[in-house]
Amino acid sequence: LGKGGAGENAGTLELDLASIYNGVTISRAGETVDGGTTTGSFNEEDVNVDNYTLVVTNTETQEEAARGKVSELKNENGKVVLSLGEGSYAVTAYNYEGENVTVSERPYFKGEQTFSVKKGIATNVDLTCKLACVEVSIGLTSSFEEAFKDDYSVIVDNRDGATRIFDKSSL
């Protein structure tokens, strides 16, 4: 949670946080929405920002000023309002520690923004978390399936050391 230390030079961060997952073109689409894009069938834990981790870092000192689950950082009015010392900050929110994950079945949502805090002033920040990974969809034609009835596998390689092999039964 908040690390304190704002003291007499305190200002506040008032954060509005959202996750954009409608309109994401993905293969596990549950429905078609306006403009022909699709809406994914993401798990609630991945799209509900209350489950996200929020980190506020002082960009001048690189010290964390606050860290916690969004639901734990909200006040009685359901808003994230943090007292911070005057200075420059970065706020980051994400649904899980997916930054260095090379292959995952789970979507990774992340948002980042910088802002400044002035003494005695409330700084409003709108932070939007977006899909920060790539989803791969593999579709096989009927002619491929006919030609390779017995067995086959498909290898997906990200050229960064992560390889995933899908056999006939997992496609």
Residue spans for each PLM region:
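Residues at beta-strand starts and edge strands
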Residues: 9-13, 50, 78, 87, ...
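Structural motif
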Residues: 17-47, 139-148
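Residues that cap or initiate secondary-structure elements
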Residues: 21-23, 60, 88, 99, ...
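Acidic Ser/Thr/Pro-rich low-complexity disordered segments
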Residues: 28-46, 60-66, 98-106
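Tryptophan-paired
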Residues: 40-92, 150-171
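Compositionally biased low-complexity segments at domain edges in trafficked proteins
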Residues: 122-157
